[in-house]
Regions:
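Active-site-proximal segments of metal-dependent phosphoesterases and phosphodiesterases across multiple
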Residues: 370-388, 395-445
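C-terminal motif of bacterial Sec signal peptides marking the signal peptidase cleavage site
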Residues: 19-23
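Metal-dependent phosphoesterase/phosphodiesterase active-site architecture
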Residues: 26-160, 166-167, 208-209, 250-400, ...
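Active-site neighborhood of phospho(di)ester-bond hydrolases with catalytic His/Asp-centered motifs
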Residues: 108-110, 167-173, 224, 229-233, ...
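Bacterial N-terminal signal peptides that target proteins for export
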Residues: 1-11
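Active-site environment of divalent metal-dependent phosphoester hydrolases
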Residues: 116, 176-178, 235-241, 369-371, ...
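Short, surface-exposed basic-aromatic patches at helix termini and helix-loop junctions that form
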Residues: 187-192, 220-222, 430-439, 455-469, ...
Length: 565
């Protein structure tokens, strides 16, 4: 068994030294002992060290990652804010040093993918078949999704103490495959409960408490003074985020039988086929060994696993209803049951500060289960009902003189024709032009693509630069660099708006399993050959100051808000 010999970030206790974990000999984890006030990537950044070995280990051979020099990193200089004036008139300049009045501060995390790694209905069998998307099907870091979220919550609490947050929001893909136990783990971590990140029978791959990924732990819980909200992602109501749940997989997931499926990327009837056994991870082994994955015809038998009724799939409405079973605020975390339909609506809006003219419009732009597709269900879409609801919200906000932010899982205008984009480019382009007619719209925030991308949607009329908006995507909390963002909405002295979007790395000082996850996340990226060039600097992190013009009416209203007469 291999051990971590240097856990310099941990407090001195039984969990610190000589602890046997499913990790690597001499794994050096840089200390964030002096992380405060170096809390964001503006202050410091994770620098991935180059691999010199000519041998690349298999992604399934986590025990050898460190032996071949994979997963190593250290802290380096931070990334300053890149001031973006794309939406402003030609010749405009803004002194970055001038004083700014803060209107709103919040954090957003996305694509957390809380994962039951022992589910009999995984997508592990497909990881060698889909290129870089394979990382979404399998990686050793899947063992630690609960602990990474706990580290992010701890970090948000620390940031809140330094500079208070008005709210937090999760932008969808809270879980990996819409299972009840995954949804409960997500909510319970935010609520600060005892977490048992194990399913089936109790596993203890490394005997003793608090020393392996299956062991129970006490979640920190989000500071009770921070309200948190949620948006729906495709993984929150589709099997593995790609196919509607049918009776076959619904029965399999709570049974001892590993699910079998066809070619999910080409066959519309794949969920009723048995070409592949999807596989699972053996929770009794230190590294979560893959079992039961392969071409069905080439397997003598598929192993049975311990069944668990808590793995049952939840519908979209049931996921939203579960958000009401919480000890933190607001109850329901944004989702409101409508009396007319007797169901939950994945779209809602809220005003984070009673005296501030700004509202957040939370939009469900995932596909509907009733659609018939030959490929996957990861596209963005708005049918007439949701589209009309969005436009009514924007019209009301404009009429009432409120700044507006759209929060959705799937971004807009970024990947035409791709499974991570919108299903209909024409509809998407029309929506972009509609959005530009609402000058009080500041920002569309999203996840889904697991990128730190920023895009400007400038006005089509140079005489009205206010008819424009920004879009900011945020990285997945699961894969490297495992970040979330803070957003600061500021009023400049010239009555323009600055939006500071800042990447944050979770603090790992008190969380050895989050530290291991970071190591695995970096190694997995290196093994899959993934290079992030999703922003102008070609770096995984991207901090920006986004400047936006306001109408004369909103300039006056906000100036009076800051300095009332």
């Amino acid at each position: 068994m291999k051990t971590i010999k240097s856990l310099v970030f941990l407090p001195v206790c039984a969990l610190c030294f000589g602890l046997t974990l499913n990790s690597c000999d001499n794994l050096e984890i840089p200390s964030d002992e002096n992380a405060y006030p170096d809390l964001t990537t503006v202050d410091r950044n994770i620098v991935v060290e180059s691999v010199t070995s000519r041998t690349t280990p298999a992604i399934t051979d986590a025990a050898s990652f460190e032996d071949y020099g994979f997963g190593k990193w250290h802290y380096g200089p931070g990334f300053p804010y890149d001031q973006r004036l794309d939406l402003m008139p030609a010749g405009y300049s803004l002194d970055a040093a001038q004083s700014k009045d803060k209107l709103l501060r919040f954090f957003a995390l996305t694509d957390i993918h809380i994962t039951d790694e022992e589910t009999p209905a995984s997508g592990i069998v497909f990881y060698p078949k889909v290129g870089n998307f394979g990382l979404s099907c399998y990686s050793p870091l899947m063992l630690y999704s609960a602990q990474v979220l706990d580290a992010a919550v701890y970090t948000a609490n620390v940031l809140h103490k330094v500079d208070p947050m008005d709210f937090g929001i999760a932008l969808g893909d809270l879980v990996n495959s819409a299972q009840y136990n995954e949804v409960r783990w997500f909510i319970d971590i935010l609520d600060g409960k005892r977490i048992k990140p194990d399913s089936g029978i109790k596993d203890d791959p490394i005997p003793g408490p608090g020393n392996d990924y299956q062991d129970e732990f006490q979640a920190v819980g989000l500071d009770k003074t921070i309200p948190w909200y949620t948006a729906i992602g495709n993984h929150d109501h589709f099997w593995m985020g790609v196919k509607p749940v049918n009776d076959r997989v619904r029965k399999s997931v709570i049974s001892e039988n590993i699910f079998t499926v066809g070619n999910i990327f080409k066959d519309p009837n794949a969920m009723n086929d048995s070409l592949f056994a999807t596989g699972t991870m053996d929770g009794s082994t230190p590294y979560g060994t893959i079992i039961g994955a392969g071409v069905r015809a080439q397997m003598q038998q598929i192993p049975k696993i311990p069944a668990d009724a808590n793995r049952r799939f939840l519908s979209k409405n049931e996921v939203m209803e579960e958000m009401s079973r919480t000890s933190t605020l607001p109850v329901g975390h944004g989702f409101i049951q409508t009396k007319e339909e007797n169901s939950f609506n994945g779209c809602y809006s809220f005003e984070p500060k009673a005296d501030l003219p700004i509202k957040v419009i939370v939009l469900d732009d995932t596909q509907d289960e009733s659609e018939i597709r030959n490929d996957i269900y990861g596209y963005g879409t708005l049918e007439n009902g949701r589209h009309d609801w969005l436009i009514r919200q924007l019209e009301a906000g404009q009429k009432e003189g409120k700044l507006m932010i759209i929060a959705a899982h799937i971004p807009i205008g970024v990947a035409p024709g791709q499974p991570v984009g919108w299903y209909n480019t024409t509809v998407e382009n029309d929506l972009v032009e509609e959005l530009k007619t609402f000058p009080n719209l500041l920002l569309w925030i999203a996840g889904h693509r697991h990128l730190n991308t920023v895009k400007a949607f400038p006005s089509s009329d140079t005489n009205h630069p206010e008819n424009s908006f920004w879009e900011v995507e945020t990285k997945s909390l699961r894969e490297f660099p495992q970040q979330f963002r803070t957003f600061d909405i500021l009023l400049n002295k010239d009555n323009t708006i600055s939006i500071l979007a800042t990447n944050v790395d979770p603090i790992i000082r008190n969380n050895p399993f989050a530290a291991l996850s970071r190591f695995y996340a970096i190694a997995s990226n290196q093994i899959f050959g993934m290079v992030d060039t999703s922003n102008p600097n070609g770096e995984a992190s991207y901090n920006v100051e986004l400047v936006k013009q306001l109408t004369p009416e909103m300039q006056l209203k906000l100036r009076n808000y800051i300095r009332p007469r």
